[in-house]
């Protein structure tokens, strides 16, 4: 799974964004707090995101890591507003980053210190963090000189507003905020003011779609739609094609060059509080079942045919650029994240090219009922080929190579079917398929989705006895876990329970925190915390198919 997501010559993804949890609920349950009390040592292993990032860096060391928060732990909440609270939030972040480096050997790349989806960006905390990161001297002994430099170079993201457009005006009015912010991130809209585009084109700031929708349910079920727009296809309203179409429109309307999915991977129990919508489902660790949504193939039409990622300071990393004059948005961008061009509207296209002009790819997204034909004029390029390779996705036929299209008199004509994605590229490459058992990648799930049903020990599958699940919370016979260190490039082993921050197996917390202590399940927090979505504390274990089991007495 990780190799498919982060591996290959042209990786599908190059960034991992994770939440600094406070044991309160976000969209998908409670994210564990790495530092629940001011006087305890931070423990990054409580958060699976830090572990996942290390595993991703084993595959691709260039993967970037960004973190942000919804709220904060109660010991931070108790501090006075202003500098005292800024210092407490910074301490929480800093000590977590220090611990993550000690355990996994990397320093995060980006921080948004402000509250996620704030309605009023806090210039004070943005400036406080930028200054503190740059001037930090109190490093632990395990921090190398290279790690210290990486820490001083952590970049600031602001301000992850939900549709709001307040951060750029704040940057224009406050030079300290302007200097502090490296990346401008906002959510759930493709357009912005002209000043956001200027921030990218003139001021050389990064502009991100820092939270956007993933798919709306399993994409292969889209063909069951009966509405006229997109009936029987992967297109239409709130469809996989509509999702993909937001990328070129967001570039045209606000110069976004990063799209972050909420969530990219779903590993929380179905029905927990929020309808699951993800690119990849891996929520049954006892079965090994993984569902690869077909929209991953649609995204591959972009990232598998270009060198994506971050350019270095000397502009020698060879990262491809999006060409504004060869990119078009079908609906011209909107403050409605579900906007489409309509059943008889335009198609979008986006062109990425190598800095030396030797290669390029154009991606066409046609979320309409009409076939389109485009002429690609290959002027001002240094091409060594006389034809373009064509890759197409239509309903139930994903990322398939077609016949090459000749470039004649500097022009290539590309036909784009209704409700499809087509990539025309100079690259002679074959994208990876889903890692299915037969190697074809033509179906979308791995092993059979085994139900969670154990014997009285909790260690063996048994659907014939009277037990559904058992756990003694000791884990003494569990094998040690392999942990990768991105600095040394080596793997070590760690105690099973310690490696997971003393969190119980298969249990998902909501509105609180539960840990394993001395072979017992313990509720950790004795008071509620600020959270996005309130409710009573619970920890949940199970399988939705237990609904068919007879009542227990």
Where are these regions (language model features)?
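Short carbohydrate-recognition loop motifs
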Residues: 509-541
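N-terminal catalytic cores of secreted or lumenal carbohydrate-active enzymes
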Residues: 1-109, 113, 123, 127, ...
């Amino acid at each position: 799974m990780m190799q498919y997501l982060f591996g290959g010559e042209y990786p599908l993804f190059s960034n991992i964004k994770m939440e600094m949890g406070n044991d309160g609920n976000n969209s998908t349950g409670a994210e564990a707090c790495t530092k629940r009390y001011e006087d305890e040592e931070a423990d990054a292993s409580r958060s699976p995101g830090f572990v996942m990032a290390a595993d991703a860096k084993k595959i691709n060391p260039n993967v970037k890591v960004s973190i942000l928060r919804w709220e904060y732990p109660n010991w931070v909440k108790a501090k006075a507003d202003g500098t005292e609270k800024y210092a407490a939030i910074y301490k929480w972040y800093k000590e977590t980053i220090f611990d993550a480096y000690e355990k996994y050997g990397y320093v995060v790349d980006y921080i948004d210190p402000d509250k996620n989806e704030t309605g009023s960006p806090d210039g004070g905390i943005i400036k406080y963090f930028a200054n503190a990161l740059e001037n930090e001297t109190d490093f632990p002994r395990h921090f190398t000189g290279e790690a210290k430099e990486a820490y001083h170079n952590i970049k600031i993201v602001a301000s992850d507003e939900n549709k709001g457009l307040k951060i750029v005006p704040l940057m224009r009015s406050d030079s300290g905020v302007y200097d502090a912010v490296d990346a401008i991130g906002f959510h759930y809209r493709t357009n912005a003011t002209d000043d956001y585009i200027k921030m990218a084109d003139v001021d050389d700031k990064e502009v991100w779609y820092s939270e956007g929708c993933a798919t709306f349910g399993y994409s292969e079920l889209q063909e069951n739609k009966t509405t006229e727009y997109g009936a029987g296809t992967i297109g239409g309203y709130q469809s996989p094609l509509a999702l993909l179409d937001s990328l070129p429109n967001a570039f045209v309307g606000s110069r976004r060059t990063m799209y972050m999915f909420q969530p990219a991977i779903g590993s929380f129990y179905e029905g927990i509080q929020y309808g699951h919508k993800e690119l990849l489902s891996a929520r049954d660790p006892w079965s090994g079942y993984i569902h690869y949504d077909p929209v991953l193939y649609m995204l591959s039409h972009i990232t598998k045919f270009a060198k994506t990622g971050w350019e270095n300071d000397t502009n020698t990393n060879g990262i491809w650029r999006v060409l504004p004059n060869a990119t078009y948005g079908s609906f011209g961008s909107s403050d409605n994240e579900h906007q489409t061009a309509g059943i008889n509207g335009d198609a979008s296209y986006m062109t990425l090219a190598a800095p030396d002009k030797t290669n390029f790819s154009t991606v066409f997204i046609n979320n309409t009922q009409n076939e389109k034909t485009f002429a690609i004029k290959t002027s001002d390029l240094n091409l060594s080929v006389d034809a373009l390779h064509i890759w197409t996705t239509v309903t139930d036929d994903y990322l398939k190579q077609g016949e090459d299209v000749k470039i004649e008199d500097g022009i290539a004509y590309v036909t784009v079917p209704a409700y499809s994605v087509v990539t025309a590229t100079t690259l002679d490459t074959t994208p990876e398929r889903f890692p299915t058992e037969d190697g074809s990648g033509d179906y979308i799930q791995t092993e059979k989705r085994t139900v969670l049903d154990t014997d009285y020990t909790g260690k063996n599958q048994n659907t014939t006895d009277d037990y559904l699940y058992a756990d003694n919370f000791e884990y003494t016979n569990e094998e040690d876990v392999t942990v990768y260190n991105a600095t040394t490039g080596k793997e070590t082993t760690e105690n099973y329970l310690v490696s997971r921050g003393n969190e119980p197996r298969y249990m998902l917390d909501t509105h609180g925190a539960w840990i394993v202590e001395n072979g017992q399940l313990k509720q950790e927090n004795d008071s509620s915390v600020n959270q996005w979505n309130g409710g009573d504390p619970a920890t949940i274990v199970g399988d939705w198919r237990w609904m068919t089991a007879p009542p227990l007495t």
